[in-house]
Amino acid sequence: MTTSVSEFKEGNATCFVVEEKDEAGKTISKREICIRLRSIQVQGQTRYLLYDENMKVIPGTWGYLNDHIALKAPNTRKQRAYSLRQLYSFIGIIRTSLDQFTASEIMQYRQFLKGLNTKSSIDSRTILRDNSTINMHLETMRDYVSYLHLENSCFRESVSSRILLPSEYSAEPFEKEVSK
């Protein structure tokens, strides 16, 4: 079975279609992931709402975006809101929860952000992001996980990607880096 993920715009939302096909190429299932982000003005302050495809505010995001990082620069808050939208889109695609993430899923998330294909069954997307953008997304995740007090989350572990690299990824670039 293969899984393909395609991205499309719906208004100002970025959505994903996840299609699973059998070995013969017949579609087994097709689902849409659309995590929406809205900004509203409340007493002269910008507040962010992040909600799922059922139009329910995603637990934890309101407090993080509107209280925890309230004193950050407006552009930083907006970037972090977009980062959380990407994170929850990925969570919907792989059908897991944030507190169940493994090192392998973190690596898949990095590839998802880059828009690159892996040797796994998830096809690539068309968006390519540079390393500074990826690092900003990962920093947002670490801060958000810390805010949520997720004890078993491997997001907070400070481990080299050489160690976290799962078997479906090539380790050659990292081996070359070590041997220099």
Pin down the residues of each PLM region:
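N-terminal core-binding DNA-recognition domain of tyrosine recombinases/integrases
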Residues: 60-75, 84-174
